[in-house]
Amino acid sequence: MAHKILVVDDEADIVELLRYNLELDGHELFSAGSGVEALNQARKHLPDVILLDLMLPDMDGFSICEILRCQPSTANIPVIMLTAMAGEMPRLHGFEVGASDYCLKPIRTRDLRERVRSVIETCAAREAAVNAELVNAVSVDQRKS
C-alpha cells in the first residue's frame, strides 16, 4: 500500500536518493527544502511519515517538530529525524520534542526504508487498537440500552 512521505532536506541529492529508494517501496513522496515549506507541505498533504533534516536554512528540525506536535492536523504524524549530528544529546532532544525515530547521515537507505516501514506499521497497529476500543465501547453502550 502506498503511503505519503514528506522529505524535508535542503540537499537536493539527499532528497533524490530518498525519493528513488522510497518510491521503490511504492510510496508517494513530497519534498520541502526549508522549515516554512515543510510546515506548509505537512498541512497540505498530511503525510503518513515525515523525514526531517535537523539543519535547514531557516529553522532547525527540533523547532519544526515542536510546531507539528502543537497543531491538531499534524500532531500524530510520525517524524524520523535525519542528521549528521552524532551523540546522545541531539537524539534525546529529538525524542523530547516528539520525534518517532532518528537516523544518522550518511543515510543507509536500507536501514531508513526499514525504519519507515516500522513506523508505518506501528501507527497502523495503534490506529487499529483505537478503532477496536471504540467499537467495543459502542457495543457496551448498545447492550446497556
Q: Where do the protein language model's features map onto the residues?
A:
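Short hydrophobic/Thr-rich beta-strand motif most characteristic of the beta2 strand and flanking loop
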Residues: G26-G33, Q41
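CheY-like receiver
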Residues: T122-S145
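Active-site residues of response regulator receiver
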Residues: D9, D53, T83
